């Protein structure tokens, strides 16, 4: 199964025409999916049951819609107060979602499915309420490899074959998106990530520091940490994830199925607020700049504004002298195309979990996606 030209993806996505997707994705009279609306109507009121919610996030550029929903007051407009809660690792986000310390999270798409199926950790029924962003991740390799001629995947494969030493690559969570992008890219270049390399898990904000001290040869992570590695002169961008799969799904708004059942109106209100923030971010250059200035602060990503702002505007450099304007940079709304939680997206992550041995047998792909993605 491949991201590009996947028949399953094409079939399911083309079954929803543009008008249907925009109706589902745009804040309006209903604001959220039919599944959530049905729960709301059963309750007889649309007032949020829980007025204050904690939403966990990892310091990454794509936490922006959660943060800006709070900062810009979109949450209050929908009758809730969002408290963005900075977390240290994806494992911590998982654990706090499962035990109820967090109500929602900005979270890796594949992580939600891993928890739902109990892969390498606790099992709990989960829910994806919306997709938070497309694109905007990358694979960074150490500058030391470029000095030896490994400036892309093919060059890396040749160098690994010649040196015959153990190579170490990092991703951010075993069932997460970054692991899947890394594995897919390595395999596409003839490198078996399960046999030909050592793969470790490192939280996103620690990637650059770990590469600086030589703990890994490369990593896959979200921005701004790939650009930060270039700014610090220790790494270069071997590929962006949008070059692997244009407009791929990335982070989602995740919660437990139990929370949605207990607080359907709150789930509706939070989804609507973050959707409105997503639209606001993508509306203008000025909004993106303000967003970058906000999330660069210590309470959120804690990095320089330039580390965020360049790639959020599509201004890329690879750290080896190449610069380009990428029209497929990180998007939060993109005229409503980003946010619908396609069943086919969830199913694709399941196929990759099976491909890399995280799932030992084939699940009912469609049934699992229907259980998790609230459409």
Give residue spans per PLM region.
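Secondary-structure end/capping motifs
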Residues: 262-374
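Short gly/pro-enriched beta-turn/loop segments at secondary-structure junctions
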Residues: 247-248, 290
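N-terminal secretory signal peptides
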Residues: 1-16, 20
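N-terminal export signals
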Residues: 13-14, 20-42
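Sec/Tat-exported extracytoplasmic proteins
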Residues: 101, 106-109, 116-119, 143, ...
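Stable alpha-helical elements in mature extracytoplasmic
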Residues: 62, 93, 111, 178, ...
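Short, glycine-/small- and polar/acidic-enriched structural segments
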Residues: 43-201, 210-230, 234-247
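Short glycine- and hydrophobic/aromatic-rich loop-to-beta-strand nucleating segment
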Residues: 139-140, 252-255, 259-260
């Amino acid at each position: 199964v491949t991201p590009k030209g996947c028949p399953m993806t094409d079939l399911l996505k083309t079954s929803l025409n543009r008008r249907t997707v925009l109706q589902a994705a745009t804040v309006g009279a209903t604001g959220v999916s039919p599944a959530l609306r049905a729960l709301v109507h059963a309750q007889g009121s649309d007032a949020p049951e829980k007025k204050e919610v904690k939403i966990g996030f990892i310091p990454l550029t794509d936490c922006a819609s959660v943060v800006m929903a709070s900062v810009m007051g979109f949450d209050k407009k929908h009758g809730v107060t969002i408290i963005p809660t900075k977390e240290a690792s994806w494992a911590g986000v998982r654990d706090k979602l499962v035990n109820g310390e967090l109500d929602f999270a900005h979270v890796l798409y594949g992580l939600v499915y891993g928890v739902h199926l109990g892969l390498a950790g606790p099992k709990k029924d989960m829910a994806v309420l919306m997709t938070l962003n497309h694109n905007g991740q990358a694979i960074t390799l150490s500058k030391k490899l470029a000095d030896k001629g490994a400036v892309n995947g093919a060059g890396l494969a040749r160098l690994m074959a010649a040196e015959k030493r153990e190579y170490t690559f990092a991703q951010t969570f075993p069932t997460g998106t970054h692991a899947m992008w890394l594995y897919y890219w390595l395999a596409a270049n003839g490198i078996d990530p399960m046999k030909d390399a050592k793969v470790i898990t490192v939280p996103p904000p620690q990637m650059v520091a770990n590469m600086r001290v030589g703990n890994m040869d490369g990593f896959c992570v979200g921005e701004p940490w790939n650009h930060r590695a270039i700014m610090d002169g220790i790494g270069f961008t071997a590929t962006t994830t949008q070059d692997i799969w244009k407009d791929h799904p990335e982070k989602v708004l995740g919660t437990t199925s139990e929370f949605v059942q207990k607080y359907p109106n709150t789930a509706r209100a939070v989804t609507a607020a973050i959707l409105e923030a997503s639209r606001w971010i993508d509306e203008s250059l000025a909004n993106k700049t303000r967003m970058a200035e906000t999330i660069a602060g210590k309470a959120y990503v804690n990095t320089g504004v330039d580390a965020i702002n360049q790639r959020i505007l599509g201004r890329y450099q690879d750290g080896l002298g190449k610069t380009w304007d990428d029209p497929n940079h990180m998007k939060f709304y993109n005229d409503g195309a980003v946010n619908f939680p396609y069943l086919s997206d969830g199913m694709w992550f399941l196929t990759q979990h099976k491909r890399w041995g995280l799932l030992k047998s084939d699940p009912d792909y469609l049934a699992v996606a229907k259980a998790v993605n609230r459409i």
